[in-house]
Curated annotation (Swiss-Prot):
Lineage: Bacteria, Bacillati, Bacillota, Clostridia, Eubacteriales
A single GO molecular function term of this UniProt record: (3R)-hydroxyacyl-[acyl-carrier-protein] dehydratase activity
UniProt xrefs under InterPro entries: FabA_FabZ (IPR013114), FabZ (IPR010084), HotDog_dom_sf (IPR029069)
Organism: Clostridium botulinum (strain Kyoto / Type A2)
Gene: fabZ
Protein name per its UniProtKB record: 3-hydroxyacyl-[acyl-carrier-protein] dehydratase FabZ
GO cellular component terms listed in the entry, alphabetical order: cytoplasm; membrane
Amino acid sequence: MEKFLDINEIKKIIPHRYPFLLVDKITELEEGKSAVGYKNVTANEYFFNGHFPEEPVMPGVLIIEALAQVGAVAILSKEEFKGKIAYFGGINKAKFRKKVVPGDVLRLSIELTKIKGVAGVGKAVATVDGKVAAEAELLFVIGK
């Protein structure tokens, strides 16, 4: 099932807010299974002031966080988890393959590969222009 969520609809599902909300829209959502979202990376991002002033690069940890936020939308849209919070449980196999710079459009996709009770695992991939920028296996747990 494909679903489009704008920023206001995303904010109804996850608690993140500026400056830590790192997803602009969700273009595909299969509740409890997968999601695809986008982040428009602009020169005005707060983190570019210090990372790095002469060569701005989006920190890898924030790319992973953006992927986790898309994953949170996927799992928290499932009826039994609506109104709850998804917490990071861990990160495995993280790889950073391409710099993300101002002007890039970051495509963030996640497939939830295992859910057991309130814990689960997702395979996440961030791309720019079809090239992998980062990938990781994200572990999560659902809180109250």
